[in-house]
């Protein structure tokens, strides 16, 4: 099939066997599917479309579910898509992605693809399956700025692109850059992950004030990972695997504990009132909790049933002496994230033998 092809709805409804939560399976075709990485929204703000990647044509392509009809539409027909780079705009007009060494803006009405930038880089991401190797990108909440990392020789580079003109500025070059995220309350502030032993960094959009926000405790052999912003607070949350989630304020450096269970990939809703996380070793289901109140216990909303491959997560921090090769296919991880209106949570699961996309409804009055 080709760009613009419409597929009938594949939606199936059922209830979680253990929690009774209402779940909708969005895709059913026997192929690999996944929504964007958990730090990237899967919907536009008005929830007209759910954006995802499907391998049903033989290569990863961008698809949407048109939510008013349930139909699926293929948006791209490429052989060079970087499938974890996909980032929908908040206003619902575009999807941004990288392919080859170029950055593209796709119009969701006309399906026109406009090349915004060509880095002519040796490669756009690191080798492997995790972290900087995923090639995720970041879009400011006003949709004006798009941040991309790529390689310049042996170094990583961070560039910020004007989404209208394609004019860009390279604001940082260093040993390792990944998992870029604009602060939801400040389009001039970007989080990025540095080396695995020194991850938590922030930088201004213009390249000034590049600083370490949190220093890993080497004596405790801390495993700091999967950082995400808490809207409305200027706090950056991070997983202290497997001991829970802490956060730190970028202005005051005040730190606090959010929760103490084995949260794996965790992200807030846009309002900053709820947080969701998948779990592993052991998998105790997808959990919802309040990032503002660490005394409130998390609640299990459903069980994704994903294989969550990545045996290195079962032991202590494995990167103390440098990067190691791991096997952790990302489409086997649930990566839950909220819809803009917080009524549902999207996740991926390969429970059926193929990675499919699901939505679970957030119970009303959960608190």
Predicted regions: what is each one?
Residues 36-40, 82-87, 127, 132-137, ...:
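Repeated scaffold domains used in trafficking and secretory/extracellular systems
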Residues 14-35, 318-326:
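A short helix->beta-strand "capping" segment at the edge of beta-propeller domains
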Residues 32, 36-39, 59-100:
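Blade-loop segments of beta-propeller domains
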Residues 243, 258-314:
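Loop/turn-rich, solvent-exposed surfaces of beta-rich toroidal or solenoidal domains
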Residues 329-367:
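Blade-level signature of beta-propeller repeat domains, shared across WD40, Kelch, NHL, RCC1
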Residues 51-57, 95-108, 137-139, 143, ...:
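Beta-strand C-termini and the immediately following turn/loop, strongest in propeller blades
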Residues 1-24, 149, 157:
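Blade/loop signatures of beta-propeller domains
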Residues 80-155, 171-172:
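Asp-box/WD-like beta-propeller blade repeats and closely related beta-sheet repeat scaffolds
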């Amino acid at each position: 099939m080709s760009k613009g092809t419409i597929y009938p709805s594949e939606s199936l409804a059922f209830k979680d066997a253990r929690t009774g939560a209402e779940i909708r399976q969005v895709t059913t075709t026997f192929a690999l599917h996944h929504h964007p990485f958990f730090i990237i929204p899967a919907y536009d703000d008005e929830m007209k479309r759910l954006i995802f990647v499907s391998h049903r044509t033989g290569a990863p392509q961008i698809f949407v579910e048109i939510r008013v009809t349930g139909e699926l539409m293929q948006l791209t027909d490429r052989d060079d898509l970087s499938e974890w780079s996909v980032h929908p705009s908040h206003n619902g007009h575009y999807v941004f992605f990288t392919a080859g060494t170029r950055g593209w803006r796709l119009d969701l009405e006309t399906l026109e693809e406009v090349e915004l930038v060509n880095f002519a880089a040796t490669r756009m991401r690191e080798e492997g399956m995790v972290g900087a190797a995923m090639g995720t990108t970041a879009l400011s909440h006003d949709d004006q700025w798009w941040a991309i990392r790529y390689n310049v020789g042996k170094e990583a580079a961070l560039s910020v692109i004007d989404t209208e003109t394609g004019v860009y500025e390279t604001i940082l070059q260093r040993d390792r850059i990944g998992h870029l995220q604009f602060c939801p309350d400040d389009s001039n502030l970007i989080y990025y992950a540095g080396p695995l032993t020194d991850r938590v960094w922030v930088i201004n959009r213009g390249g000034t004030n590049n600083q370490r926000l949190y220093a890993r405790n080497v004596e405790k052999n801390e495993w700091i990972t999967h950082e995400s912003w808490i809207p409305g607070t200027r706090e950056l949350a991070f997983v202290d695997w497997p001991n829970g989630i802490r956060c730190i304020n970028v202005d005051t450096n005040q730190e606090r504990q959010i929760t103490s269970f084995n949260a794996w990939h965790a992200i807030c809703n846009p309002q900053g009132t709820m947080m969701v996380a998948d779990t592993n070793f052991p998998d105790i289901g997808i959990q919802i909790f309040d990032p503002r109140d660490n005394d409130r216990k998390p609640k299990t909303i459903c069980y994704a049933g994903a294989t969550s491959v990545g045996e290195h997560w079962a032991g202590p921090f494995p990167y103390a002496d440098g990067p190691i090769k791991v096997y952790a296919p990302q489409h086997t991880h649930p990566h839950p994230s909220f819809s803009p209106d917080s009524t549902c949570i999207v996740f991926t699961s390969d429970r059926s033998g193929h990675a499919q996309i699901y939505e679970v409804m957030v119970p009303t009055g959960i608190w």
